[in-house]
Structures are given as structure tokens and as C-alpha cells.
């Protein structure tokens, strides 16, 4: 195993795990923060894309570009919904539900690509769903108002949009990761520019701006660089295991710095979610399922 690549992956996931904490300190809305994040990522990753020479070697195919732009819409919505979830619920709960994305991908593969799903996978889906209910808190489901204000919907929507990004983007093979992210963040700028009020950025403290720019340049620029640079050098099994550094760091920061104290039911829910996800990611893929995969229209 490439130890340098593994270290880069661990650092990138650990940094991304702190994004919930950063979000809480920015003092701006989810939409405004994602808007700045898209601008920072476009500048940082676009600059690397040019400096490293990847831009000159890109193979542009119309279908891949369209697919990338569609992924961009879901990627930006994923960020907005995740940040809204951070505003409404604990970071631990939001990040646990957000990590249900692989479960959604499993379901989509079964419904649209004819991939086989066995009884163990169905059980994993059910366990993850129950876990998400436990994490939010059963008391939040006693009334419609409590449910709508719990942040559960935002967290589920963020997981779904992240899953759509993975599902639609799985057949993008010619464009580099820098090109796809550059195009997707450009989409985000155009999506959010009409709805973000510049008045939100007036009266912010220096600390607010440091957290805002940190979310943009560190969590989107630097983290994505480390992630892309290490991803191609590591086996899929190692990558699948190391991505759990992200939620682990997020939950630790929530407990240690933000004083989140989960109930025993929430702890059980977190265990259910990540148990189901780990099984889904690490279970062997039947050859028949691989053979049945086809490109999306």
C-alpha cells in the first residue's frame, strides 16, 4: 500500500470531518456559504488544473460534459442541504444520516441498473433506516412541526443528492477529477448567485471570514486536491475504510468542542447506520451484478 497516499487520504478525510464545526462559526446562511465555497473551489482547483497541465490533456466528450453538469446541480444541492442540516440538528446526527448515501446508491443500482440485491443487503438498508430514526430522536416524530424542524429532511436530502452525484457520475471516465469539479463548482456559482444576498456578508467579524474562507479553500480546495491525488493510488477497499475518518472526526469534534451528548438511543442509531454502511461497502459484488451494469441514457 502507498503510505504517502494513505496519509493524504486520512488528512483529507479528517479535515473534511471538521466542516460541520466550521459551518457553525461562519455566521452566514447555507446558500451563502456554499456560494463562497464554489468560488474558492473554482479558483483553487481551476488554478491547479491549469498549473499541473491537466487542462491541456483533457478529452472532452459531449455526453460526459452534460453528465458532469447534471452532477454539479446535485453536488451543490447536497452541500446546501447538508449545511442546513448542520443548522437544525447536531453535527453527529447530520453527518450520520448524510453517510447513508451509499445505501441510496445501492437502491438506485437495484432499481435502474438491474443490480442484484440479496436479503443481507435489504437487511442493511432496513438497519440504516432504523438507525437514522434513532439518531434524530423518536420524540421528533410525535408531531409534524417537530419532524419538519428536526433537520431530518435536510440531512436525508443531502444524502440523496450526494448519492445522485455518485450514481450519475460513476460513468465519467475521460474527464479528470479537476475538470469535473471545476465544471460542477461553476454550475454552483450560476445556481446560487441569483438567490444569495450580498448583504449577508456585511458586518461579519474577522473570525467569521476566516471560517468562511477556510470552508472554501481548505475543505473544498486543499481537501479535494489531497483526495484526488491519493484516490488513484489506493485500492478501493482501503479507500472505503478510510472515508470513515470523516464522520469519526465530525462526531468527536461535536462531542469534545460543541458539547454534544448523545443519548443511548442516538448511539445505537449511529452504530446501526455505520454498521449497515460498512457491510454495504465491504460486501463482495456478484459478477452478475457487474455484468448487468449499463451506461445511463
Label for each model-derived stretch:
Residues 1-35, 39, 73, 143-171, ...:
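Glycine-/small-residue-enriched transmembrane alpha-helix faces in small-molecule transporters
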Residues 2-5, 27-35, 59-65, 137-160, ...:
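Juxtamembrane helix-entry segments on the extracytoplasmic side of multipass membrane proteins
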Residues 6, 62-69, 117-129, 152, ...:
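Cytoplasmic-side transmembrane-helix entry/capping segments in multi-pass membrane proteins
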Residues 14-18, 22, 48, 69-84, ...:
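Hydrophobic alpha-helical transmembrane segments of multi-pass membrane transport proteins
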Residues 26, 33, 37, 85, ...:
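Hydrophobic/aromatic residues within transmembrane alpha-helices
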Residues 27-33, 80-98, 175-179, 225-242:
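Structural motif at transmembrane-helix junctions in multi-pass transporters
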Residues 28-77, 104, 160-165, 182-200, ...:
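Transmembrane alpha-helices of multi-pass small-molecule transport proteins
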Residues 45, 49, 108, 120-139, ...:
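Hydrophobic transmembrane alpha-helices of multi-pass small-molecule transport proteins
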Amino acid at each position: 500500500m502507498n503510505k504517502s497516499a494513505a496519509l493524504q487520504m486520512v488528512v483529507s478525510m479528517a479535515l473534511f470531518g471538521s466542516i460541520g464545526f466550521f459551518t457553525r462559526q461562519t455566521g452566514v446562511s447555507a446558500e451563502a456559504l456554499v456560494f463562497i465555497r464554489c468560488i474558492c473551489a473554482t479558483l483553487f482547483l481551476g488554478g491547479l488544473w491549469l498549473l499541473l497541465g491537466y487542462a491541456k490533456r483533457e478529452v472532452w466528450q459531449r455526453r460526459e460534459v452534460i453528465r458532469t453538469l447534471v452532477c454539479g446541480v446535485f453536488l451543490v444541492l447536497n452541500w446546501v442541504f447538508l449545511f442546513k442540516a448542520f443548522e437544525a440538528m447536531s453535527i453527529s446526527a447530520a453527518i450520520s444520516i448524510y453517510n447513508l448515501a451509499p445505501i441510496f446508491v445501492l437502491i438506485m443500482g437495484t432499481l435502474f441498473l438491474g443490480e442484484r440485491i440479496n436479503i443481507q443487503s435489504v437487511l442493511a438498508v432496513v438497519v440504516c433506516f432504523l438507525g437514522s430514526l434513532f439518531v434524530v430522536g423518536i420524540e421528533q416524530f410525535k408531531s409534524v412541526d417537530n419532524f419538519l424542524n428536526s433537520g431530518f429532511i435536510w440531512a436525508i436530502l443531502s444524502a440523496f443528492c450526494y448519492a445522485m452525484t455518485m450514481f450519475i457520475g460513476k460513468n465519467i471516465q475521460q474527464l479528470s477529477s479537476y475538470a469535473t469539479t471545476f465544471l460542477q463548482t461553476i454550475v454552483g456559482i450560476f445556481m446560487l448567485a441569483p438567490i444569495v444576498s450580498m448583504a449577508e456578508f456585511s458586518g461579519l467579524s474577522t473570525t467569521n471570514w476566516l471560517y468562511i474562507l477556510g470552508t472554501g479553500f481548505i475543505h473544498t480546495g486543499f481537501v479535494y486536491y489531497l483526495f484526488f491525488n491519493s484516490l488513484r493510488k489506493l485500492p478501493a477497499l482501503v479507500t472505503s475504510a478510510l472515508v470513515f475518518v470523516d464522520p469519526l472526526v465530525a462526531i468527536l469534534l461535536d462531542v469534545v468542542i460543541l458539547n454534544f451528548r448523545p443519548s443511548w438511543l442516538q448511539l445505537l442509531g449511529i452504530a446501526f447506520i455505520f454498521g449497515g454502511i460498512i457491510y454495504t461497502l465491504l460486501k463482495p459484488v456478484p459478477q452478475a451484478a457487474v455484468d448487468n451494469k449499463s451506461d445511463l441514457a
